Amino acid sequence: MMAAASSPEKLLQLQEVDSSRAGSRILSPILGSSSPGLSHETSQPICIRSPYTDLGHDFTTIPFYSPTIFSYGGPSISECSSVHQSLSASLFWPSHGRVGTPITLHCPQGRSQQGQSAQTPWDSVITTSKSVRRRSQESEESMVSSGGKADLHYCAVCHDYASGYHYGVWSCEGCKAFFKRSIQGHNDYICPATNQCTIDKNRRKSCQACRLRKCYEVGMTKCGIRKERGNYRNSQARRLTRLSSQGKTAEPKGITGPAEGSLNKPEKPALTPEQLIERILEAEPPEIYLVKDAKRPLTEASVMMLLTNLADKELVHMISWAKKIPGFVELSLVDQVHLLECCWLEVLMIGLMWRSVDHPGKLIFCPDLSLSREEGSCVQGFVEIFDMLIAATTRVRELKLQREEYVCLKAMILLNSNMCLSSSDCSEDLQSRSKLLRLLDAMTDALVLAIGKTGLTFRQQYTRLAHLLMLLSHIRHVSNKGMDHLHCMKMKNIVPLYDLLLEMLDAHIMHSSCLPHQPPQQDSKDQSEVPAPLHSSAGGPSNTWTPSSARAGGESQ
């Protein structure tokens, strides 16, 4: 009051206002009648300059807006102490009949206050809203950087979407497989043009010579394999893990989910028959080419050389195909080896029938090798096997076998090949056998679903299922004939066998001659006589195993 009296301007102190004026003229927003701060201690006298009173100025309500109107995420006005103090009841006009302590309004500030930086009641709200907006922008930027196209790569050869980091560069599955075939086999490709063919997504198969040349130009090397490959699926999984961890850290500590234990240890859900068929279709190996043309006329040695070379290449892809069958790698290592050793020729023969179904009277061993009955007659004892294969292929053509049915039958041949070999009573073998039976049941359901898609009646579906299963017995019979013939060719030293093919042949003969009452010591002795480990792939040891090493690995586990 002393400072107000010393002011050159005339101030008027109001003690009481008419009730009709006080009810409609409010100088600040009303937070509520029960708002705290109505005590006399927080009230100050109100000083209004005389010109305002002389002119009869009309004081209308001053509007205050909530921060939420401006999209601020700060605290409410009632939670802010500075704003709450400035909006106390001391700013209101006194009600009629009550003489309250006068409130000071429009009072001139002292020099000490003028020197300080002016702070408004909204400073804390604006600061809070800015920090909230900054955190939201940072979270959006992190989400974009983690879940955007940062992990998307293109093939350096054909510019298709890359599936991973293969042979030293980012490449797609097609160019990776092509380069792998080229460095493993013959790569004496010849360009029909000027060695300047365009290699892109649509024309990458037009010229093998220019495609291989571009593979070397972009930096693909035989030894350029990373230990931790940049697989696109793994990067997606890591990205989802980061996003889930960010969501967990942003969640309040006091709030927990109802099934926190189930989230930490999720159970692997079983695949539906539809999903199982899709996975098996994706696991199909690529087409294999001999690259070199067969010299005519064909001889017994040249035909056997071509067939054994092709079979050795197919065995490499067969191992990779088997590992992609859902649930196969969950079996014991010994069972995985036994299954492949007992069914490899059956798998090759059903693939041969599938490729030859549209070519009556011929067997299509690969896209660049087809033989007729007359051409196969140059090999001693091969005509009988050729006729059996032609008859089985004719039966497949009569049944109009669909691709989904074919892949299911092929997987069933793999899983049903050594049902009678597991005679051990140890817990690990019994557990692996139970897994194998569950896999067979799932594969049978997938085959039934594939048959149901043909649009037949239920009775016709049952009949078709029986015909398809009876076809497997014919394939096994032809496989046994082919195994005996291949063993005779080996004993006569007509053609040198490759390492992987030789091991598979010896292992199959050993299993077929094994008696049920044979002691386990003798069995382990026979297993140790199998040839040395085989390195079938330049990409790594994923396609390499021996029966002896497999058993040693199983015992160590």
Curated annotation (Swiss-Prot):
Q: Where is this region: Modulating?
A: 1-154
Question: Biased-composition ranges for Polar residues?
Answer: 539-557
Cellular localization per UniProt: Nucleus
Q: What is this protein called?
A: Estrogen receptor beta
Role noted for this protein: Binds estrogens with an affinity similar to that of ER-alpha, and activates expression of reporter genes containing estrogen response elements (ERE) in an estrogen-dependent manner.
Task: Please name the PANTHER family in this protein's record.
Answer: KNIRPS-RELATED PROTEIN-RELATED (PTHR48092)
Q: Which UniProt keywords apply?
A: DNA-binding, Lipid-binding, Metal-binding, Nucleus, Receptor, Steroid-binding, Transcription, Transcription regulation, Zinc, Zinc-finger
Name the DNA-binding segment ranges: 155-220
* The record's note on its domains: Composed of three domains: a modulating N-terminal domain, a DNA-binding domain and a C-terminal ligand-binding domain.
- NR C4-type zinc finger positions in the chain? 155-175, 191-215
Paired cysteines (S-S): none
Location of region: Disordered: 240-268, 513-557
Read off the Gene3D superfamilies from this record. Answer: Erythroid Transcription Factor GATA-1, subunit A, Retinoid X Receptor
Q: Which CDD domains match?
A: NR_DBD_ER, NR_LBD_ER
Q: Gene name, please?
A: esr2
One GO term of the biological process aspect: estrogen receptor signaling pathway
Instruction: Please tell me the species this chain comes from.
Output: Oreochromis niloticus
Please give an example of a GO cellular component term from this record. nucleus
Indicate the quaternary assembly.
Answer: Binds DNA as a homodimer. Can form a heterodimer with ER-alpha.
